[in-house]
């Protein structure tokens, strides 16, 4: 069903899920639920339909946290740093694998519920902000100014550009402790992407 599928820890983590295509849409949510390579869930079904309706013949669902959980409040308050880093690098890898990256930001209000959501967002953005990336949101923003989660959408809506830099600086109140160190931000995105892609295409991965 889905030829893009990366999971870990006996499927307790899902890094990426999607379908290959000539025109790819990357989606960044909060955390994965029950969808697998052989079975979609409600979120994946909506995401795939929105992608097709808007001219994308492929998509990949990524998340700020890779831990599977059906309710966000059941996620741990803290997460292993290496799990976070591996997930962040995979997000970067998939985004940069597209010649003209388009990224649908789709986390909703829940991004404020765990610090590691914000840490992951900052890491990914700061690492690749010099790249030409089309950051998008679908439909109206939430009352608090967050890009809306796919569980609450109208297929008649459309994509609009999203100023992710301003969002991080002002919409999200970001304590200093959440910001990556200067050493972390020195990661070369092309190098990270090459290392992760070595020997295989990012959009043709089933494990």
Regions found by a protein language model. Name each.
Residues 1-41, 53, 207:
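Active-site and ligand/interface coordination hotspots across diverse enzymes
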Residues 34, 68, 111:
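Feature marks short, surface-exposed loop/turn motifs that line or immediately flank catalytic pockets
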Residues 75-189, 203-206:
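Glycine/proline-rich loop-helix segments at beta-alpha junctions forming the active-site rim
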């Amino acid at each position: 069903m889905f030829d893009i599928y990366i999971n870990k820890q006996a499927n307790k983590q899902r890094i990426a899920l999607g379908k290959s295509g000539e025109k790819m849409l990357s989606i960044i949510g909060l955390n994965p639920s029950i969808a697998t390579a052989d079975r979609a869930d409600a979120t994946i079904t909506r995401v795939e339909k929105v992608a097709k309706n808007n001219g994308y013949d492929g998509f990949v669902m990524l998340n700020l946290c890779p831990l599977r959980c059906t309710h966000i409040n059941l996620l741990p308050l803290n997460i292993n740093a290496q799990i976070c880093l591996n997930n962040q690098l995979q997000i970067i890898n998939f985004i940069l694998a597209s010649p003209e990256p388009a990224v649908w930001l789709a986390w909703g209000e829940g991004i404020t519920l765990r610090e590691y959501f914000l840490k992951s967002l900052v890491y990914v953005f700061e690492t690749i902000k010099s790249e030409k990336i089309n950051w998008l949101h679908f439909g109206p923003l939430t009352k608090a100014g967050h890009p809306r989660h796919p569980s609450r959408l109208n297929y008649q809506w459309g994509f609009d550009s999203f100023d992710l830099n301003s969002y991080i600086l002002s919409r999200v109140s970001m304590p200093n402790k959440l910001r990556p160190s200067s050493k972390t931000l020195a990661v070369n995105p092309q190098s990270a992407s090459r290392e992760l892609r070595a020997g295989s295409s990012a959009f043709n991965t089933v494990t």
